[in-house]
Amino acid sequence: MAAELEGSKCLSGLLSGLAQDTFYGHPGITEELLRSQLYPEVSLEEFRPFLAKMKGILKSIASADMDFNQLEAFLTALTKKQGGITSEQAAVISKFWKSHKTKIRESLMNQSCWDRGLRSLSWRVDGKSQSRHSAQIHTPVAIMELEIGKSGQESEFLCLEFDEVKVNQVLKKLSEVEESISTLMQPA
């Protein structure tokens, strides 16, 4: 059994399948599919604990968002642990994490956002060309465009126009927010 679970290609495929199911939301990846495609000679009773172990390891690595030094320390500890993993399995897991870390992290970030977020912000200063009152023509106005949306969905755009008074009010509020954050961040 142990030799059958050693193959690096099979383990790499298993980790990819687990990532598809666990992090990317592809529900078609089942325990039976992984076993039949990657480890057909291993019984389901032998495969289940191995699958659970690899899934747990992958979830631990992803939830801690391990950098490569942390990963190496974690995998080294697992190789020394009774019933842990082999050094060959550790090498495959390390290689897998190095090539999939960014994509898994992005997927977890997208899953953790419940509401829409700010995707982009652009602004410019223009001269007002139309107004109800002729005295307001050619006065400077700040135009701000916000792109708001959730990953995987179409964005909405919000366009705001500020005169000089409103810009100063916004800047004052931002300064107050900055002061509040600085106060909260002061060591006690």
Curated annotation (Swiss-Prot):
- Chain spans, region Sufficient for interaction with SLC12A2: 1-122
User: Which keywords describe this protein according to UniProt?
Assistant: Copper, Cytoplasm, Cytoplasmic vesicle, Endosome, Membrane, Metal-binding, Nucleus, Protein transport, Transcription, Transcription regulation, Transport, Ubl conjugation, Ubl conjugation pathway
GO BP? copper ion homeostasis; negative regulation of NF-kappaB transcription factor activity; negative regulation of protein localization to cell surface; negative regulation of sodium ion transmembrane transport; positive regulation of protein ubiquitination; protein transport; regulation of proteasomal ubiquitin-dependent protein catabolic process
**In its keyword annotation, does this UniProt entry include Nucleus?**
yes
Entry-linked CDD domains? Commd1_MURR1
InterPro entries on file? COMM, COMMD1_N, Murr1
Location in the cell reads: Nucleus; Cytoplasm; Endosome membrane; Cytoplasmic vesicle
PROSITE patterns, per database record: COMM (PS51269)
Provide the binding site for Cu cation. Answer: 100, 109, 133
Q: Where is this region: Required for binding to PtdIns(4,5)P2?
A: 124-188
Taxonomically, which superkingdom? Eukaryota
Q: How is it modified after translation?
A: Ubiquitinated; undergoes both 'Lys-63'- and 'Lys-48'-linked polyubiquitination. Ubiquitinated by XIAP, leading to its proteasomal degradation.
Pfam families in the record: COMM_domain, COMMD1_N
> Assembly state and interactors?
Component of the commander complex consisting of the CCC subcomplex and the retriever subcomplex. Component of the CCC (COMMD/CCDC22/CCDC93) subcomplex consisting of COMMD1, COMMD2, COMMD3, COMMD4, COMMD5, COMMD6, COMMD7, COMMD8, COMMD9, COMMD10, CCDC22 and CCDC93; within the complex forms a heterodimer with COMMD6. Interacts with VPS35L; the interaction associates the CCC complex with the retriever complex. Identified in a complex with an E3 ubiquitin ligase complex composed of TCEB1/elongin C, CUL2, SOCS1 and RBX1; in the complex interacts directly with SOCS1 and CUL2.
Function according to Swiss-Prot or TrEMBL? Scaffold protein in the commander complex that is essential for endosomal recycling of transmembrane cargos; the commander complex is composed of the CCC subcomplex and the retriever subcomplex. Can modulate activity of cullin-RING E3 ubiquitin ligase (CRL) complexes by displacing CAND1; in vitro promotes CRL E3 activity and dissociates CAND1 from CUL1 and CUL2. Promotes ubiquitination of NF-kappa-B subunit RELA and its subsequent proteasomal degradation. Down-regulates NF-kappa-B activity. Involved in the regulation of membrane expression and ubiquitination of SLC12A2.
Q: Which family does it belong to?
A: Belongs to the COMM domain-containing protein 1 family.
Q: Write down what this protein is called.
A: COMM domain-containing protein 1
Q: State the organism of origin.
A: Bos taurus (Bovine)
